[in-house]
């Protein structure tokens, strides 16, 4: 509505040479506007373990060579350019970066879209203390993103493998293991071969199954071969003998009935993967049977148990209704016993009478007239 740009002026700031202002003047009595922008002037040498992002916006009118001119010769040997964040630049100030999202009225035609220059250091040695510091999360100062991205990429795998052999229980190592890369599995396979009882080995076994169970199985077999006297290993290293072989023929796989295998409180890391799978498919139900006498005659087995006792004696205590039902057979089992005893008493009584001697007596004749 009559507002037009009458003049554009660049204002430098001596205190911050790379920070400048664009003064936009309008006709019609409108107030001037100031736009802050940045222009690269410093030459960056780059410290080891850092990245360089000079205030230079790459647009269609600029080149990577212009952006790289702000790196020292030594830095150019170590750093490579990667995509940076989006930026806006003044067309008449190539490489400048505007410090605002909303473009003032009348200046739209002078603004170009681009991406900021960004360089990362690829000249890292895995023995360098800085890369170890970044990957092990000791400090994130000057750490490039490839070494501080929570192990999403494999750039830290080599250094973390050496670190986690020494400190496998540390939080960074466990976060690295959680990414489930094979180099981490190989590292923890070596550790858990000697320290399977450690809690981080439980995570290791869980992460390897089912796709990479070979790593955890190798660690379990190695550990249990060195600790045969450890009850936790008895499902894996059960002594081989004829008795066990016969039991397996009769009862099925030992993982379904051997206590060292069936104990639900046992950590899965003490079972091989196929044993762990087999245990979930077992159809056996354990129970206790009390036998008084066992008689074997050829192929006939005769079990003799004490059945006359109260059923309630072997009943697990539960709610009241269950106990009452369990005690009913105990009451009714007394009645037939009493009847039998009564019958025996009556029979004995009559037999006693029948067997008694006859009393001698004289015959008395009585006549009635």
UniProtKB/Swiss-Prot annotation:
The keyword Membrane applies. Disulfide bonds: none annotated. It comes from the Viruses. Residues 352-369 are intravirion. Coiled coil: none annotated. Residues 2-330 are virion surface. Induction: Expressed in the late phase of the viral replicative cycle. GO terms for biological process: membrane fusion involved in viral entry into host cell; symbiont entry into host cell. GO terms for cellular component: membrane; viral envelope; virion membrane. The chain crosses the membrane at residues 331-351. One of its GO terms (molecular function) is lipid binding. It is a single-pass type II membrane protein. It is found in: Virion membrane. Its main location: virion. InterPro entries: Pox_virus_G9/A16 (IPR004251). The keyword Disulfide bond applies. Keywords: Disulfide bond, Fusion of virus membrane with host membrane, Late protein, Lipid-binding, Lipoprotein, Membrane, Myristate, Signal-anchor, Transmembrane, Transmembrane helix, Viral envelope protein, Viral penetration into host cytoplasm, Virion, Virus entry into host cell. Most cysteines are linked by disulfide bonds. They are created by the viral disulfide bond formation pathway, a poxvirus-specific redox pathway that operates on the cytoplasmic side of the MV membranes. Pfam families: Pox_G9-A16 (PF03003). A lipid is attached at residue 2 (N-myristoyl glycine). Envelope protein part of the entry-fusion complex responsible for the virus membrane fusion with host cell membrane during virus entry. Also plays a role in cell-cell fusion (syncytium formation). Part of a stable entry-fusion complex (EFC) which is at least composed of proteins A16, A21, A28, G3, G9, H2, J5, and L5. Formation of the viral membrane is necessary for the assembly of the complex. Interacts with G9. Belongs to the poxviridae A16/G9/J5 family. This is Virion membrane protein A16 homolog. It comes from Fowlpox virus (strain NVSL).
């Amino acid at each position: 509505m009559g507002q037009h740009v009458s003049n554009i002026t660049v204002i430098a700031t001596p205190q911050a040479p790379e920070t400048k202002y664009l003064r936009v003047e309008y006709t019609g009595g409108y107030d001037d506007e100031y736009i802050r922008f940045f222009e690269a002037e410093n030459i960056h040498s780059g410290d080891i373990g850092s990245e360089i992002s000079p205030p230079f916006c790459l647009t269609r009118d600029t080149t990577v060579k212009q952006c790289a001119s702000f790196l020292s010769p030594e830095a150019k040997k170590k750093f490579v350019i990667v995509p940076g964040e989006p930026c806006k630049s003044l067309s008449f100030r190539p490489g400048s970066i505007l410090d605002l999202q909303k473009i003032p009225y009348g200046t739209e035609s002078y603004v170009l879209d681009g991406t900021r220059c960004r360089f990362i250091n690829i000249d890292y040695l895995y023995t360098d203390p800085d890369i170890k510091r970044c990957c092990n999360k000791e400090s994130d100062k000057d750490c490039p993103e490839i070494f501080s991205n929570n192990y999403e990429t494999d750039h830290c795998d080599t250094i973390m493998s050496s670190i986690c052999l020494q400190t496998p229980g540390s939080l960074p190592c466990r976060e690295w293991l959680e990414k489930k890369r094979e180099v981490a599995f190989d590292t923890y396979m070596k550790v858990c071969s000697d320290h399977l009882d450690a809690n981080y080995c439980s995570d290791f076994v869980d992460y390897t199954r089912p796709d990479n169970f070979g790593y955890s199985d190798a660690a379990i077999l190695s550990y249990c071969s060195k600790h045969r006297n450890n009850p936790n290993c008895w499902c894996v290293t059960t002594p081989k003998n004829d008795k066990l072989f016969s039991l397996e023929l009769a009862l099925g796989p030992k993982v379904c009935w051997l206590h060292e295998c069936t104990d639900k409180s046992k950590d899965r890391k003490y079972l091989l993967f196929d044993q762990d799978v087999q245990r979930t498919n077992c159809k056996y139900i354990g129970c206790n049977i009390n036998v008084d006498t066992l008689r074997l005659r050829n192929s006939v087995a005769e079990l003799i148990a004490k059945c006359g006792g109260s059923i309630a004696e072997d009943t697990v205590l539960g709610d009241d209704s269950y106990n009452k039902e369990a005690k009913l057979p105990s009451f009714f089992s007394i009645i037939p016993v009493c009847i039998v005893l009564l019958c025996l008493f009556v029979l004995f009584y009559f037999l006693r009478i029948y067997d008694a001697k006859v009393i001698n007596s004289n015959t008395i004749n009585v006549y009635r007239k």
